[in-house]
From Swiss-Prot:
The modification N6-acetyllysine is found at K70, K99. PANTHER family: ALPHA-CRYSTALLIN A CHAIN, HEAT SHOCK PROTEIN HSP-12.2-RELATED. It holds the Pfam family Crystallin. It is found in: Cytoplasm; Nucleus. Belongs to the small heat shock protein (HSP20) family. The gene is CRYAA. Residues 1-63 are annotated as: Required for complex formation with BFSP1 and BFSP2. This is Alpha-crystallin A chain. Acetylation at Lys-70 may increase chaperone activity. Undergoes age-dependent proteolytical cleavage at the C-terminus.
């Protein structure tokens, strides 16, 4: 009689609450079996499992912060250079577009493209918006907020992406 040895309850996947990479923003990277079948992955390959906390930290999901003084967007775009990125402000929205043509990588040829659109708060000073790309591929879009009653100046314009040589100081969630 064969008896299946199960992992302790605290090492098993958490079912629908287990973070999957399926909707992460790893533009063009491959999917693994646990991305598509998180319930079965521990039974198919019980000795290989990505850490729950590492998955959450490396998820690549953009983060938007809006506090009293400023508005900031952090977006992981590690596969793109500043020349591949376009950041535009149109009315109350910021649009971030990244595209690079087909290039060769370790497994063949790949091309990537993404679009993100975020609503700007009405009190963000659009004349002082800035955008930078850190050495580790974190795009930071930020703008100061103005006191209520002051015109924030809404117009359509492109925001240049500057390159920083130091790694990002973005939150690690």
């Amino acid at each position: 009689m064969d008896i299946a040895i199960q992992h302790p309850w605290f090492k098993r996947t958490l079912g629908p609450f287990y973070p999957s990479r399926l909707f992460d923003q790893f533009f063009g990277e491959g999917l693994f079996e646990y991305d598509l079948l998180p319930f079965l992955s521990s039974t198919i390959s019980p000795y290989y499992r990505q850490s729950l906390f590492r998955t959450v930290l490396d998820s690549g999901i953009s983060e938007v912060r809006s506090d009293r003084d400023k508005f900031v967007i952090f977006l992981d775009v590690k596969h793109f250079s500043p020349e591949d990125l376009t950041v535009k402000v149109q009315e109350d929205f910021v649009e971030i577009h990244g595209k690079h043509n087909e290039r060769q990588d370790d497994h063949g040829y790949i091309s990537r493209e993404f679009h993100r659109r975020y609503r700007l708060p009405s009190n963000v000073d659009q004349s002082a918006l800035s955008c930078s790309l850190s050495a580790d591929g974190m795009l930071t879009f930020s703008g100061p907020k103005v006191p209520s009653g002051v015109d924030a100046g809404h117009s359509e314009r492109a925001i240049p992406v500057s390159r920083e040589e130091k790694p990002s100081s973005a939150p690690s969630s």
